[in-house]
Amino acid sequence: MNTPQKPIHQVLLAVDGSEHSLAAVKTVRDMALAATHCRECRVKVLGVLPVSEGSNYAAYMLPLREAERLLNEHSISATADLIQGYPAEVIVDQARVMQPDLIVIGAKGLRATLGILLGGVAQQVIEHACCPVLVIRAPYRRINRVLVCSDGSVCSRKAIEFAANFPFIEGGDFHLLHVLPPSPVLTPELLARVWTLSDDALDPTLFTTREMEAEVEASRKAGDMILHEANELLLAQNIKAKTMLLQGDAATEIIQYASDNAVDLIIAGSRGLSSMQSWLIGSVSRKLVHYASCSMLLVKQPLA
């Protein structure tokens, strides 16, 4: 049974005056205007004042006031707050206090005096925040073409449910993608057969038998089922998506597909990580945030 997705009422918007930050502000404006039926929407515009810049409070407030004005003039309830500290830490701590439905942050910040969202901050927020995080890349563009990624996990399902209820501009073009592993799935039986052989005795034909072909077909059928179930979640919200099954390295295939199809936003699941796990190499979501040329929405699977 599907659990109804909680509407996006409370948004925490990190602002520093950079072009990516301004694109984030305009995206939040679009979201709120697309969800005009929601009269409970509130946006907190958050800025971070570096510890060493305490005397420049007024300068750091300028982009926050501008963001507040831009939202308010479209009848969007927004308030600005500037807090001294370290960017990722302040944003995550404020999210814990506010419990927003969504954090919106620019992919990169100003690499100058007013820059707060420098490289790594967005990633740290994604990994430690308690809610979904929308990472916006400049230049600003309306979100019309959306790529939803599914791997069949609980985390992925949560992302799809969030995507199905996200306030997109009407008439958006949706794509639904699943990526099969780059090589056939090896069953425990096949692995045991290989590991018991010496290097000299290893027969390459072990990997081209009917048994292996059956595993390849089973993998493809499983992928088709993942796409079908994900598509059903979108159809339940009257979202029709083009489905695509690819094979290879997941992050590479997703990034290439997004580039080839001029995608504006990639949506994927992202497991919440503990402090010990926070720099786990090989994370698909991390690769997407670093290398995708479009904006990203990472929907968290809370830690147990």
What kind of region is each of these model predictions?
Residues 2-59, 74-76, 145-210, 233-242, ...:
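Small/aliphatic-rich secondary-structure junction motif
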